């Protein structure tokens, strides 16, 4: 019940009532690979180790996303393949879903591309980015930015958001 994304929205006395305060960390690829293999077993689909790792690497460090991607890859394997998930069907499926090799989706790349192409890499304000990409500022800040910052594609400065050298290299 006390799981709140923005703890600062709670008063100090209310925060103090929660006995344990936890901070969730992203999972590393090897742990996620094990989760993907286990979930494949639950879904009764066979998966190669390299395919499980590929799903893990593109899942943004999050088991929920890894499982969602696995289900979509399984669907591709059932329709386009023979029901078995190998590295080729995994890459085809994830490419069709617009999930690139670094786990960025279409909106992640659109945000970075907009900052680079329209605003010369920044700095640019959150509301300006939101208007330019057609997404709510809160969604960008809470859904997309944390991963982009964690992975080193984006940085937040007092003057606004800036694309990093990694973002330029990633988008070519």
Regions found by a protein language model. Give the residues of each.
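Conserved C-terminal "switch" segment of AAA+ ATPases
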Residues: 9-15, 21-89, 97-104
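Non-catalytic, well-ordered alpha-helical scaffold segments
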Residues: 53, 64-67, 71, 88-91, ...
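Terminal-proximal interaction/regulatory segments of ATP-powered molecular machines
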Residues: 115-172
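Conserved alpha/beta core segments of nucleic-acid transaction machinery
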Residues: 75-123, 127, 131-134
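Short, small-residue-biased leader/transition segments that mark boundaries at the very start
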Residues: 1-5
